[in-house]
Amino acid sequence: MNKIILEDLKESNVPLYIPQILPHQLATLDFLNERSLKEKKSVLLFHKMGSGKTIISLLFSIIASIETKILIILPNTSIMDIWISKLYDSLLLLNKNDKYNLNNIEFTTRSRLNEELLGTNKNINDIITENIKKYDNYIIIIDEAHNFFGNASGELLIHIKQNSTARYVLLTGSPISNTIESLKDIVELLTNETFEYNKYIESAGNKVFQQRINKQGIELLKNKLTGLISYYDEDRKDIPSPIFQGNIKLLNYPVVLCPMSKLQEDNYNMISNQTENDMFIKLMMNVSLVALGDKENYTNFDLLMASNKQIFPNFYVSNGKFIGQELIDLNISSKLKYFMNSILTSPNAGKRFIYFANSTIGSTIIRSVMIANGISEYDKEIVNNFVCVNCLKERNCNNKECIPMKFVIITSKESNKGNNSYINKILSVFNEDVNENGSVIMFLFGSRIIAEAYTLKDIKEIWFLTVPETKSELEQCIARAIRSFAYKDKNTRVVVRICLATTPNALSNEISQIIEKYKDESLSDEEKTLLLNKFEMKLVNYAIDLPYDLRKQLYSEFKSEKAKVAYNIFINLSILTNNILNDNILKCFIIEKIRRYSYENSRYKLKDILSYIKKNLKFDYKNKIEDYVNEFVNDGVVVYNKSFGTCYIDWFKDDIVVKQIILEFNNYLLSYNY
């Protein structure tokens, strides 16, 4: 990052609701311009989730489009549509009259890229060379890059790098999201170095969390990645701080332990005894959410829903639906019982986002439970025994009309079916000001697709009914809701609950004691490392006795603690520069200074804005700054003024003034006065 830009723009803050390039974003643009565009190197943007990697990438793509072609790879088509729409919003932050070539910016998805290059081939070496060579001199930007590490997609990217002159910009808030194996992909995607796994990684066992980078590996990272990483993780003072609630704190977070009923515990133990190596098996995730009887009911769920049968007393399948008193008593699900008890005793609590990962079984049981308890599905018929947003089950709002609670479920199935417009429509309704308190849609149940790119507004509670695969995925979900523009009041109380289905005395005394010791803030790094090693041994020894949810959360947090070694290396490899600004970045900097000055001032002298722009610059740019200011005024750069709103700048005699942009409508034409 460029230190001059970073420190200068921090001095002249403007409200975050106005269009602008934030200080760290413009400072990162300089980094990308120097390393990727000028030096033709691959780089990693390790920026905290919610810090604006999207806008940085789009601005850089627009600037780079003058010189080269850019390919942006997104997780799915729905997210790709969002990026494409934001491309034109980003253009308004620059000078619209510059000779950008937006035709040089291409978008694709991970699956499309795989299909295009691999087709039906399973062997990466069989890819036709011409298919790779077309990416010569491309800058390839990869969103959520950590999802490419350690799989076939990552191998494909490495193959492209080895057989073309393409360079990468990797975007991630969590480079090592699952295992230390990610380091191999990071090194090979950023450099021409081959990462010899057995040489640089040592293992204390066959569990993923038992692997660690050795001293040789640390030296390799320092030697090869210095200057190729941009790190940003500044605490935001303009957003609410999430409040984690729970009845016990593990290594990182408080969690809610939800003891299973005897019915659910017996069902859990039966399935667990029939399942080998059940740590990351989807089956146990489903069993931890809801008791459905025999193992075949989980593995052949479609057949179960097509039948008419009793699963437990007071719990049946009939005509493709779950029915019975158990949907209300909820002995079948300790997590749903805790969740329902909370929402049915909390009037006017606002909007909730509820994360769950088991889309088929999860969607079906959640829908059945919500409807049985009086909460209607959005855009469907209102249930007879509805629960009111304001008075809950009383349905007596002081002679006012009651508002039925409603929910909606969004999973990757909608995206896979191509229903991106449906997802965008639902989220648009959910985020509207009229739904600020949840009167239109109160509950949004979402899977991982929400965590990847969508933004949620005015969320008051975030629930996790299934344990995310990694700590970074958990943080992504939270970051999608807690953003600078998502709340009118930064002091809004936002509660986060991670729910774990547990059995009695789930945590052994030894593991509990280590966790308590680890929380001691006075511990040295060496003492923490020793405790982590001890914790690792206990996890291995007691793993089989721990309930699935608790085990998975402990593994996730433990892996996160182990990954801090590599993270700290990455952080230290990120450097601040004081370089002279390249013309592309100097233009962006000048426009941003004009934008900030024009927020407070609607009329000013040329000499005043020049003085304001130059005051912290350490290099002499001769006449460039004045020439660019004149150019931008003549071109009518768009700004935002606190009195007049959206404006453009223009000359009035010898002064620079802001002129309001006014939309004018008649029966034939929507135009604007510019």
From Swiss-Prot:
InterPro entries: Helicase_ATP-bd, P-loop_NTPase, SNF2_N, SNF2_RAD54_helicase_repair. Keywords: Activator, ATP-binding, DNA-binding, Helicase, Hydrolase, Nucleotide-binding, Transcription, Transcription regulation, Virion. Its EC number is 3.6.4.-. Pfam families: SNF2-rel_dom. GO terms for cellular component: virion component. A motif (DEXH box) lies at residues 135-138. It is found in: Virion. Heterodimer of a 70 kDa and a 82 kDa subunit. Part of the early transcription complex composed of ETF, RAP94, and the DNA-directed RNA polymerase. Acts with RNA polymerase to initiate transcription from early gene promoters. Is recruited by the RPO-associated protein of 94 kDa (RAP94) to form the early transcription complex, which also contains the core RNA polymerase. ETF heterodimer binds to early gene promoters. This is Early transcription factor 70 kDa subunit. It comes from Melanoplus sanguinipes entomopoxvirus. The gene is VETFS.
